[in-house]
């Protein structure tokens, strides 16, 4: 009997991608995988439920995939992820197209749920409460480029920012054991991974729950010992939780990219307080200055929310001044999304959508000018570039200054470049967010 074919659509962030990779790793031994939904007997949609735009995309994708039940081979539609965890039975009632629903802690049940359905048991699985589940990544099927993989070091969040639903979806902060992280990293390296990207809802507080103190610096130190790993990149660092030992480890460890993602969200003390952030403008700027002083050529990325309830013109102007004067290397901007079940959703002084959008565009225009200025100063410099693909004209890769998907890239000319290899590249031209360079002779490895 031919194996059933399983297809998956993974939505949302890189943490969701890891969840999808875990599920694919589990089902690949029992079923045949396909990227073509027209061929799939079973379709899994791993949803995002963080903000309104993501929720709508998830719902639309489920409905799109449900059409293959009548037009093609699909016999079973499974919804997983944050949207299912957040809405549970309510989602099942609203979307009868879903045959099986699994929450963010139920991925170990994926094969059992599929088999039960095949055997005639049509009971819809319910989402499990996060407190019943420990962190265990298991075998993953990596979906990124061969040389790069995300490595989750913790799950959940204890920060409870007033705009954020994640603690209710993903649960309390739980660190993985260091031994588990290192073991998975070694397996990734054996399979050709050269860049590890450390992720969690909050990477900087790693270890505080299981070791009694922050241990991210120790994670970096141990991962750097693994043969084959060349770059270690850290995302989702809360600035108020960055500590001296971590800064020192980044500065002295050659394998740790001089790159940090600091999701500050805003700079006005008024807005930070309403957001429930545990820091101030002065502390954020102080931390940025510390990092720039102690880590040579560090690249700093942040994400910002504009249009938060009560954000006055003065607050917004303060944010604009911050963009113009501090000149962070990379900035992502989001308009505030009013999420039911969060304290911010019932705050007074909600901002009109038109104002939010205008503020988003204004910040991005300012950051575009900053980015152009920063990139122009890179012309003539040489970088180690990890080559990821060839588009027919250029090789495309990234330097240590660029995380995949969220930052720019380097278009590389010249002979000798190879996919999944590092090449020394000299920058010849600066674009708004990207760079153009040429391979230095005999430089690829």
UniProtKB/Swiss-Prot annotation:
Its EC number is 2.8.4.4. Keywords: 4Fe-4S, Cytoplasm, Iron, Iron-sulfur, Metal-binding, S-adenosyl-L-methionine, Transferase. GO terms for cellular component: cytosol. It catalyses: L-aspartate(89)-[ribosomal protein uS12]-hydrogen + (sulfur carrier)-SH + AH2 + 2 S-adenosyl-L-methionine = 3-methylsulfanyl-L-aspartate(89)-[ribosomal protein uS12]-hydrogen + (sulfur carrier)-H + 5'-deoxyadenosine + L-methionine + A + S-adenosyl-L-homocysteine + 2 H(+). It comes from the Bacteria. Its main location: cytoplasm. It is found in: Cytoplasm. [4Fe-4S] cluster 1 binds at residues 13, 48, 82. It is an enzyme of class 2 (transferase). Binds 2 [4Fe-4S] clusters. One cluster is coordinated with 3 cysteines and an exchangeable S-adenosyl-L-methionine. NCBIfam families: 30S ribosomal protein S12 methylthiotransferase RimO, MiaB/RimO family radical SAM methylthiotransferase. HAMAP family: MTTase_RimO. This is Ribosomal protein uS12 methylthiotransferase RimO. It comes from Clostridium perfringens (strain 13 / Type A).
């Amino acid at each position: 009997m031919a194996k059933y074919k399983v297809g998956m659509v993974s939505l949302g962030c890189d943490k969701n991608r890891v969840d999808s990779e875990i599920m694919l790793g589990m089902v690949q031994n029992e079923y045949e995988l396909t990227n073509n939904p027209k061929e799939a007997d079973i379709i899994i949609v791993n949803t995002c439920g963080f903000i309104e735009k993501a929720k709508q995309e998830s719902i639309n994708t489920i409905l799109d995939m449900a059409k293959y039940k009548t037009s093609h081979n699909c016999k079973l539609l499974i919804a997983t992820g944050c949207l299912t965890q957040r809405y549970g039975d309510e989602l099942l009632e609203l979307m009868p197209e879903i045959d099986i629903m699994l929450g963010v802690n139920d991925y170990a049940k994926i094969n059992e749920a599929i088999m039960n359905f095949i055997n005639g048991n049509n009971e819809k699985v319910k989402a499990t409460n996060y407190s019943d589940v420990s962190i265990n990544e298991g075998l993953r099927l990596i979906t990124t480029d061969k040389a790069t993989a995300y490595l989750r070091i913790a799950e959940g969040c204890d920060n409870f920012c007033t705009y954020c639903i994640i603690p209710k979806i993903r649960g309390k902060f739980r660190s993985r054991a260091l031994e588990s992280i290192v073991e998975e990293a070694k397996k990734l390296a054996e399979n050709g991974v050269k860049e590890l990207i450390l992720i969690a809802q909050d990477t900087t507080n790693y270890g505080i729950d299981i070791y009694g103190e922050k241990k991210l610096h120790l994670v970096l130190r141990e991962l750097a010992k693994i043969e084959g790993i060349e770059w270690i990149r850290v995302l989702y660092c809360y600035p108020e939780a960055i500590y001296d030992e971590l800064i020192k480890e980044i500065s002295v460890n050659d394998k740790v990219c001089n790159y940090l993602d600091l999701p500050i969200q805003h700079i006005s003390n008024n807005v930070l307080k309403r957001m429930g952030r545990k820091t101030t403008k002065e502390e954020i700027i102080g931390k940025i200055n510390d990092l720039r002083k102690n880590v040579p050529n560090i690249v700093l990325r942040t994400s910002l929310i504009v249009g938060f309830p009560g954000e006055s013109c003065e607050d917004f102007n303060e944010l604009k001044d911050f963009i113009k004067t501090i000149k962070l290397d990379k900035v992502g901007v989001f308009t505030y999304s009013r999420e039911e079940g969060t304290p911010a959703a019932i705050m007074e002084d909600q901002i009109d959508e038109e104002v939010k959008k205008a503020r988003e565009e204004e910040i991005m225009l300012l950051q575009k000018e900053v980015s152009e200025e920063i990139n122009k100063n890179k012309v003539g410099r040489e970088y180690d570039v990890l080559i990821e693909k060839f588009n027919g004209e250029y090789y495309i890769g990234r330097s240590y200054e660029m995380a995949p998907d969220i930052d720019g890239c380097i278009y590389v000319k010249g002979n000798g470049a190879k996919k999944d290899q590092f090449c020394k590249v000299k920058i010849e031209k600066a674009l708004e967010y990207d760079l153009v360079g040429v391979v230095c002779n005999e430089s690829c490895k």
